[in-house]
Amino acid sequence: MRTLFQTIKQQFLEENDLVLASITASSGSTPRGAGSRMLVGKHGRITGTIGGGAVEYRAELMALDILEKKESDEHEFRLNRKDVENIGMICGGDVTVFFQYLDHNDPIVMEIAETAEKSYEERKDFWLICDLHATSGMSLYSPCYGLIGNADVPSSILSSLSAQPFR
């Protein structure tokens, strides 16, 4: 994840828009699980992976389309013989990928990337929170720095995050 935030920051400084492709749900046999992320720019995948192979290739093409449309979207890949898209995978599972459009002019995303980097340097816990609805907001929550971003996050969620035993 550290590389992801460093790359977002660098790409934004170069005035490049991005798409963050994240697996939000998976079931059955799939190459990668929920939480896997890949960052895509105008020339394709920059960093991260959502499993490689046909799913990642198709997701990369969809991300390039998202860059042109400048709107976030979601897509479900069905990995079986009866797959309507027939991407050639028969793992037997399903993968849902959320494509979050990141505008390089958005100061909130830059602040999130900078705060994440600072949190890594100081070895502080934080959570990236992505709104998977039409607004596709993004926030970062850290007990040290508070809530940064534009995702609508109830305070009850924030207080429960601080008590979680994971990073």
Where do the PLM segments sit?
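Segments forming oxygen-rich coordination pockets for charged ligands
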Residues: 1-167
